[in-house]
Amino acid sequence: MAGDPSEYFMEALGHVLITMVSMSPCTAQAKDMPEFKGEALNVRIEYSGKHSGELGLIMERPLASLIAARILGLENGNDVFDDMIDDAMRELINVVCGHFLTLMYGYTPVFKISIPEVFRINGAACTMLLSNPNICTFIVDGFPLLGQVRIR
């Protein structure tokens, strides 16, 4: 294992968003992030084996709807129901996790990957997270997106 986990996470997220949904995340300083205006989705996944940790993504529903629509091949995010969004977010974090693990640890280690979970959190909690130094901050199509890597 060499390198900064956050750098590998940013690389994995960028690659996955570009290839899966044709979106490019732009890294941003916390002070430059757009405000979270409402409820957000927090999707998390854990991995264990020789190494263990957790990855997470937090985004508002409009961005999650847009990503879900693109994953599902729909015209726009208005046609996507909550359960479809949750499933798409689980798939997104699962693919990001797989790419992250390969970048971080190589092709040899075998990991057990948890079933991703989706939680709702309010915008105020998202704003508080911006001060956490372990949070990666991105802007995707004008929307805020937070990422987190926790190595155990």
Located regions from the model:
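N-terminal auxiliary interaction/assembly segments of multi-subunit proteins
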Residues: 1-152
